[in-house]
Each structure stands twice: as structure tokens, then as C-alpha cells.
Amino acid sequence: MAFNKRSRNITQGVARSPNRSMYYALGYQKEDFDKPMVGIANGHSTITPCNAGLQRLADAAIDAVKASDANPQVFGTPTISDGMSMGTEGMKYSLISREVIADCIETAAQGQWMDGVVVIGGCDKNMPGGMIALARTNVPGIYVYGGTIKPGNWKGKDLTIVSSFEAVGEFTAGRMSEEDFEGVERNACPSTGSCGGMYTANTMSSSFEALGMSLLYSSTMANPDQEKVDSAAESARVLVEAIKKDIKPRDIITRKSIENAVALIMATGGSTNAVLHYLAIAHSAEVEWTIDDFERIRRKVPVICNLKPSGQYVATDLHKAGGIPQVMKILLKAGLLHGDCLTITGRTLAEELEHVPDQPRADQDVIMPIEKALYAEGHLAILKGNLAEEGAVAKITGLKNPVITGPARVFEDEQSAMEAILADKINAGDVLVLRYLGPKGGPGMPEMLAPTSAIIGKGLGESVGFITDGRFSGGTWGMVVGHVAPEAYVGGNIALVREGDSITIDAHKLVLQVNVSDEELARRRAEWKQPVARYTRGVLAKFARLASTASKGAVTD
């Protein structure tokens, strides 16, 4: 049986003699043309610590592909550092990079007729970008997460990158000394690897274990550790076996497996960005999935992991406590996962979890049993109302009472909001409205970690609301509501809010509304005019033209 069903289109037959000539230049031998061609989509980059440790993983995958009697073909994918671009115009490129990465992988895999692809990535958008490509092309593939960073430490306190963002607010509020401010800055990121809490990178990589597209335990390993290198090699070996078994992404990515992934996200307290990304992944896999499905699962699945940003621990702690397999086994025993879903190994999820204990160890408090859940329901709530007729996403963990009604403080760019926060012009009870930051208006839905962290640092996390048609970082917590749709740029009602309007955020009732009459909104709408596009050329303009609404994943195809 031939295992090069795709690559034979480019290597076999008399007419492909020139093609083989080029392969000979790369060191191929005649017998290699009967072997599968396996792409290694290598996201290595020295732009960011999230991706700076990926080359070792790519090298291990290359060696494992060769040892499995297949041909590795290495190509690069770009990355944007969300942490570094945060609060700047560069953040507008973050979500766009998801689409660019997906397009890069699709282009290489399809253009070169690859028989399979090992995708290796680190920073936030690397994960959904890679998975969108695998789902879109349906070429056999596996995702290798670059691994988490190790926690930093200053004066005995563990740190993550969010510690540094929050320190900005604390320092400007006079609640932190200059010594401690600089100490946090210098020690927040002590190694290579992606940001350490259950932020977007760890959320998406963890969910890929539940989805069935990554190996068990791989998402919580630290990038510098040898086990991460070994896992990359094993992932490549497993992919070659999947090629031989003809297991394709769409055999794995189904409505039921996406339900598993979302249940895992709820149980671990994951990032709001997962909503946007799983809408896009489902779209690419041609799986029926809507924003309302997240709310359906939220009501069934409790939060059982005590993880940052709204909890205490980081990914390395989760790994020591049993990792994602332990969380999944608890959910499976509670009837909250579909155990019959296929995984990349060819085994079902239930079979993969057979060796995992039914309950977490008693000597840790990172993973809790169901009966001791931190929250009875999931934390990512879908709010609707006259400010979000298509829906908006709220993260409701970490708050004593996720309800507020207060005056709108309206900003049309992040910098103005940040200046107001740092100048103590935002008061308890206010509701910040940041708009014209959606998929088309931003464009690119930039993340708002800097202002939300400054609010936390100022001690206002429980008392100030924050809504936007942009996004929030996975490191954000507080009374925040993002992904408001329809967005302001297309005339969503968020565009009609005026300074001082009464706004209600009620996560219990799942309501997001501006408390003015329908007649007044209609009058304002008649006066509203769409702003001139911020960009007319280049990738930002292209994304603005193509992107769908956030409630459908901000996809471009």
C-alpha cells in the first residue's frame, strides 16, 4: 500500500523527471520518492520567547520523521508577539497573523503535495492558525505546542508576564516601589516558552489535547525541558503512523470533539480568545458550530482548575498535578466528555485516558474534583442585548459579583483609555467603552491587556466595567466583555453609545445593554456615519475587507 498518495503527484512518472531533479539537489535518493513527504511547519523565531525555543523541537521532529522512513520538508511560519505588540499599533497584526499562518501552511502543504504536516508553534495565534490550516486542507497533521515558560520570581512571589502589565498600574498608583517595579520587569520571563498562565497559548494548546490533535501531556510541558523535545519527536512518529492509517484532521475534528475541547477550556478557566478561534476552526472543518454552543456547554461544565489569570497557579504547576489528561479524566467520569472521539493516535479519547486516575491527587490544589469545583458553571459567558445583538464574550471568574450598571466612558482608541486610567480619570462604577476596534474597524480586533491590567493595578478590577468590540488577552480578568458584535464600524449599537449613558453588564442574566430607549437609538442611528477606513493598502486593509463578524470567528474565507 502506498503511503505517498499525495506526494506521488509531484514525484512519480516520466513527466515528473524535472521535479525529481530538484529533489536530487536536496540530497534525495531514488528510493525516497516512494516515501511519504512530511512537512515540518516550523514557527521558530527570535522575535519572542514563546517561539525562540522551537528549533530544538523542529530538529527532533525532523530526525523522527527520517527514522520513521519518511521525508521531512521544513518550511517556516511567521509569528507576532502578542505580549510585545500589546498596546501598540502592532497589536492589530496579531489576529491577522492567525490567518497568515493558516494561509502559509495551506500554501506549502497543498503546493508541494505533502502527505502530512507537523505544525510547531508557540505564541497565541500560532495554535489556531495551524489548526485552521489542518482543518481546511484535511491533510494528515498533528500539532506540537512549543511549551510553556517557567514561572518568574521576585522576592518569593511567582510571576508571569501579566504581573508586569499589572505592575504598570500599581506603580503609577503609588502602590509599588521603583525597586519592585524593575524587579518584576526583569524577572517576569525567566526562560523560553509561552506565557505561563491559562492564557491564550496554553488555552489553545491544552484544548488540542481534548480535540485529539495533540499528544497527551504535551501542552503543559515547559519549553526548556527535555521531555518537550522528546514529545516533539514522538508527535512526528505518531503522525507518520497516522498517514499510514489514513487518519485525517476531519476524522478527528468533529462537533463532538469540539464540544470536548470547549468543555476542557471551561474546566481550566481558559481564554476568551478560544471562542473566536473555535468558531474559526469549526468553520474550516465545515462543522456546524455557533457562538451559542459555548453558552450551552458553559452551563454544564464547572471550573475545576485553580489557574491564572483568575486563579493561583501556572501551567508548570498543572503539569505536576497531572496535566490536561487528569482534567479530562475527571470530566469523562462525570459524563462531560465524549470518550468515543478519535484521536491522532488512532485510539479513542477514552482509550487514551485509561491509564489516568479517576480523581486528582489529594496533595495538590491545582486540579479539584467535580464536587469541590471552584465554580459550578463555566466562566466564558455569552452576553446579548441591545449592545450585542449577535453576542459578546464575558469572562466571569475571579469576580465577587459580575454585575454593574454605570456611566459610559467612551474611547475610540486604546491609548486614550490608557491615558485616562493612568491619570486617575476613571472611577469606581464607570463602564469603559472601547470601540471601532473590531475585525473591520480596528482592524484586527487588538487585545486590551494594557488598560485592563492598569485597571487591576489601580485596584478597580471589581468596580469598573469594560466593554469592547476588540479582544482581551488571555491574561485579562475583571468585569470585561469583548467581541461585541455587530462591531461599531458596521453600525453596531456600540457605535451609538454616548459619554454618560447608563450601561448594564449582568453576567448572571447574560445581558449587555445600554439603558436608552429604542427610539433614541433609532434617532442616533439616523445621524451615524461610518468612519473612513483607517487603512487602504496592505494586509490590514485586506483583512478589514475580508473579515467576518466576531460572532462567526472573524474568518477571511
Curated annotation (Swiss-Prot):
N6-carboxylysine: residues bearing it:
K125
The note on cofactor binding and number reads:
Binds 1 [2Fe-2S] cluster per subunit. This cluster acts as a Lewis acid cofactor.
Q: Please name the catalytic residues of this protein.
A: S473 (proton acceptor)
Q: Which Gene3D superfamilies match?
A: IlvD/EDD C-terminal domain-like (3.50.30.80)
Q: Name one GO molecular function term.
A: magnesium ion binding
Binding of Mg(2+): at which residues? D82, D124, K125, E447
What is the enzyme's main class? Answer: lyase
Cite the entry's keywords alphabetically: 2Fe-2S, Amino-acid biosynthesis, Branched-chain amino acid biosynthesis, Iron, Iron-sulfur, Lyase, Magnesium, Metal-binding
Question: Which Pfam families does the record cross-reference, listed alphabetically?
Answer: ILV_EDD_C, ILVD_EDD_N
Entries under InterPro entries matching the protein:
DHAD_IlvD/Edd, Dihydro-acid_dehy_C, DihydroxyA_deHydtase, DiOHA_6PGluconate_deHydtase_CS, ILV_EDD_C, ILV_EDD_N, IlvD/EDD_N
Q: Which pathway, per its entry?
A: Amino-acid biosynthesis; L-isoleucine biosynthesis; L-isoleucine from 2-oxobutanoate: step 3/4; Amino-acid biosynthesis; L-valine biosynthesis; L-valine from pyruvate: step 3/4
- Listed binding positions for [2Fe-2S] cluster are C50, C123, C195
**In its UniProt record, which GO terms are filed under biological process?**
isoleucine biosynthetic process; L-valine biosynthetic process
* Subunit structure, interactors included: Homodimer.
Which family does the record assign? Belongs to the IlvD/Edd family.
Function according to Swiss-Prot or TrEMBL: Functions in the biosynthesis of branched-chain amino acids. Catalyzes the dehydration of (2R,3R)-2,3-dihydroxy-3-methylpentanoate (2,3-dihydroxy-3-methylvalerate) into 2-oxo-3-methylpentanoate (2-oxo-3-methylvalerate) and of (2R)-2,3-dihydroxy-3-methylbutanoate (2,3-dihydroxyisovalerate) into 2-oxo-3-methylbutanoate (2-oxoisovalerate), the penultimate precursor to L-isoleucine and L-valine, respectively.
Q: Which NCBIfam families match?
A: ilvD (TIGR00110), PRK00911.1 (NF002068)
Q: What is this protein called?
A: Dihydroxy-acid dehydratase 1
Q: Which organism is it from?
A: Cupriavidus pinatubonensis (strain JMP 134 / LMG 1197) (Cupriavidus necator (strain JMP 134))
Which taxonomic lineage does the organism of this UniProt entry have? Bacteria, Pseudomonadati, Pseudomonadota, Betaproteobacteria, Burkholderiales
